[in-house]
C-alpha cells in the first residue's frame, strides 16, 4: 500500500480499530507528495467503462454514484490528473453540489473479469462543458456523446491503492464474453462440418 494512501486513510480511529481487532496497527507514515500514476494504473484506468465515485455533503453524508461510458471515457490527462465527461442524467446533481462545497472524492474502479480493483483519492473540479469546448471534444470524442455532455470533471490524484481481489465476483461484458466464446464457436462449427461430411 503506498505511503500517501495510508497517510490519508489510516486516521487515529482507523489505527485504533486495527489494534482492537488485530492486536496491532499499521504504520501511518508521512503524507509527503501526492502519488503519481504509473504505466500500470494509466493502462488500467484507460480501459474502464465504469466506476463508483464518492463525495461528501456539507452535512457530512457520503454519497456514492455510478459513472459510466464507453471504454476509455475515464481519461488520464497526466500522471496526476484524471478527467471524464459528465453526461446528462437524472438532474439531481448531488455529486456536483457536494463538490461545490468540498472537492474530495474517492473512486472505486473495478475490472470484474480480471478481479482487479484500484482505489483513488483526489480533489475534483467541475467545469462547464460549454466553456471548455476543446477539452469536451477530447473527453467525448463522438458527435453522439458530445450532445450528452453537460459538465467536465477533473480529478487531481492525491493517492491510490491497488486492493486485493477477495470477494470480487468475476463478471464479463458482452464484448469480453464474445472474445472468450468465439474460439469455441469456431471449433464447434469445424466439428459440425466434419460430422456433416462424414454422414
Residue ranges and their predicted role:
Residues 1-199:
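Binding-site signature for planar aromatic cofactors or substrates
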Amino acid at each position: 500500500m503506498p505511503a500517501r494512501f495510508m497517510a490519508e486513510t489510516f486516521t487515529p480511529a482507523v489505527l485504533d480499530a486495527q489494534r482492537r481487532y488485530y492486536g496491532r496497527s499499521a504504520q501511518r507514515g508521512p503524507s509527503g507528495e501526492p502519488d503519481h500514476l504509473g504505466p500500470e494504473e494509466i493502462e488500467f484506468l484507460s480501459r474502464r467503462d465504469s466506476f463508483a465515485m464518492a463525495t461528501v455533503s456539507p452535512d457530512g453524508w457520503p454519497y456514492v454514484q455510478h459513472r459510466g461510458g464507453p471504454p476509455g471515457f475515464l481519461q488520464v490527462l497526466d500522471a496526476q490528473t484524471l478527467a471524464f465527461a459528465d453526461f446528462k442524467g437524472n438532474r439531481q446533481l448531488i455529486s456536483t453540489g457536494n463538490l461545490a462545497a468540498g472537492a474530495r472524492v474517492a473512486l472505486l474502479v473495478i475490472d470484474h473479469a480480471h478481479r482487479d480493483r484500484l482505489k483513488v483519492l483526489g480533489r475534483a473540479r467541475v467545469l462547464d462543458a460549454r466553456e471548455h469546448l476543446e477539452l469536451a471534444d477530447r473527453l467525448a470524442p463522438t458527435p453522439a456523446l458530445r450532445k450528452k455532455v453537460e459538465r467536465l470533471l477533473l480529478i487531481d490524484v492525491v493517492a491510490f491503492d491497488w486492493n486485493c481481489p477477495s470477494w470480487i465476483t468475476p463478471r464479463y461484458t458482452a464484448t469480453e464474453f464474445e472474445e472468450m466464446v468465439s474460439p469455441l464457436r469456431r471449433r464447434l462449427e469445424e466439428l459440425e462440418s466434419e460430422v456433416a461430411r462424414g454422414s
